[in-house]
Design a protein with these regions (language model features):
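Short, well-structured N-terminal submotif of metal-dependent ribonuclease cores
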Residues: 1-37, 50-63, 128, 140-144
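Short beta-strand scaffold positions
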Residues: 4, 36-37, 74, 97, ...
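Short active-site oxyanion
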Residues: 31-35, 69-71, 108-112
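Alpha-helix capping/helix-boundary segments
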Residues: 41, 79, 101-102, 119-121
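Amphipathic alpha-helical segments within well-ordered protein domains
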Residues: 43-46, 84
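Acidic catalytic patch
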Residues: 69-90
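Acidic, PIN/NYN-like endoribonuclease modules and their adjacent C-terminal/linker elements
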Residues: 72, 103, 109-144
Length: 144
């Protein structure tokens, strides 16, 4: 199981990112239903696409989630509590609620994380010495 953050989804949708788009699209297609998209990530992706003038891309992504391309899951109360606890502890990190929910859901499901947001996912930790299990490293992601 892999919990997905917004960045890889946006790259998979945005052909303008060229090599990064191909990398993300191929990776997400290959992983299919192993990928869990938290509801906050679906909402953030929709808002980003629409705010940047791509409402049709937002609709297509929403429809793909409705047909089960990836697994759409809601955070539970324990996920929200952990996300809020991390958000309070790392208030100055810049991590937003969708990031924190991805972390919490991955922790509770013992899942890997797919993100491009390495700064936030490295600065927010459960405890000293903890590292989130990231599916890809910065070095693996092509420059757009």
């Amino acid at each position: 199981m892999i919990v997905c953050d917004t960045g890889p989804i946006v790259s998979a949708i945005n052909k303008g990112e060229k090599r990064r788009h191909l990398f993300a699209a191929e990776l997400l297609a290959r992983l299919g239903r192993k990928v869990v998209v938290p509801w906050p990530v679906l909402v953030e992706t929709d808002l980003l696409r629409r705010s940047r003038g791509f409402p049709s891309a937002a609709i297509v992504f929403g429809e793909s989630m409705a047909t089960g391309v990836h697994r759409l899951e809601s955070p539970n109360v324990a996920d929200l509590e952990l996300a809020l606890k991390l958000g309070k502890r790392y208030v100055d990190s810049g991590a937003d609620l969708p990031d924190l929910i991805v972390m919490a859901m991955a922790h509770h499901r013992k899942a890997q994380i797919l993100t491009w947001d390495f700064r936030h996912f490295r600065s927010v930790v459960l405890k000293r010495g903890h590292h989130w299990p990231l599916l890809v490293s910065e070095a693996e992601i092509p420059i757009p």
